[in-house]
Amino acid sequence: TFKTRTSMSKNIIIIQHIDIETPGYILDLMQEDNFNLTTIELDEGEKIPSNLEQFDGMFCMGGPMDTWMEKDYPWLIDEKKKIMEFVVDLKKPYLGFCLGCQLLGEVIGGKVVKSKPPEIGILDISMSDNYLNDHIFNRFHSSFKALQWHSYEVQDLENNNNVTLLGSSPTTKYQIFKYKNHAYGIQFHIEIKDNTVSQWGCVPEYEKALEDSLGKGALKKFDLKAQENMKLMNVNAENLYKNFKKIL
């Protein structure tokens, strides 16, 4: 009804590092809910607003750069400060995907290190024993397929009492983690749509990582595998979004 739509109209800030990495499927759901969306394209020189209190939630997306590349991408310095302010000081809801996951991990005291090996493809995620108690991921199956496309990962969060590990893959421990009960790092790509893989394959850094990992011509196979699993991945994205809305 009209009434619930207006009452649900939240202010969301979306931080992007390359224009083709958006909240994707979740973006469509937010638009259907008439959310007020502010997108900041950092790689094009846009700045994160200084008044973060106006936002109910923050999405921080992926990108071809890495967290340590502050010399090449000086805006990373301010971005980390703003994430720290939003998550630690203001204690507001945050979803970080891939690079956005790594930025959260670094901000709360973890290390971002090279993945050995990189994870690229449609791969398995296994949830931790405690995940059913989590108010965002409790609708997920205990294991599921997810799209991975990363060469770095978060480590060394074990000693942070505010961090809960929620999901891992065979080679990456911190696939899903949360800081307290409002900020989530998600290393894989839950937000993908039908055209995501073919679009991302046009980014030189992504194409190189893909071919280094899976060989020449891997994009087509990867895309087909993604299409086979798309329905399930979209259901997971929808469940994540429905639950995330409740904490906004």
Whereabouts are the PLM-identified features?
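Short glycine-/acidic-enriched loop or helix-start segments at secondary-structure transitions
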Residues: 23-25, 49, 69-71, 104-107, ...
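Conserved beta-strand segments of alpha/beta enzyme cores
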Residues: 36-38, 111, 145, 164
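Short, glycine/charged-enriched secondary-structure capping and boundary segments
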Residues: 27-29, 55, 72-75, 108-112, ...
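A short acidic, often aromatic-flanked loop/helix-cap motif at beta-alpha or helix-coil junctions
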Residues: 44-48, 120, 154, 173-174
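N-terminal beta1-alpha1 cap of cysteine-dependent amidohydrolase-like domains
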Residues: 1-89, 214-248
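Cysteine-nucleophile active-site neighborhood
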Residues: 60-131
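Amide-donor transfer/coupling interface in amidating biosynthetic enzymes
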Residues: 127-248
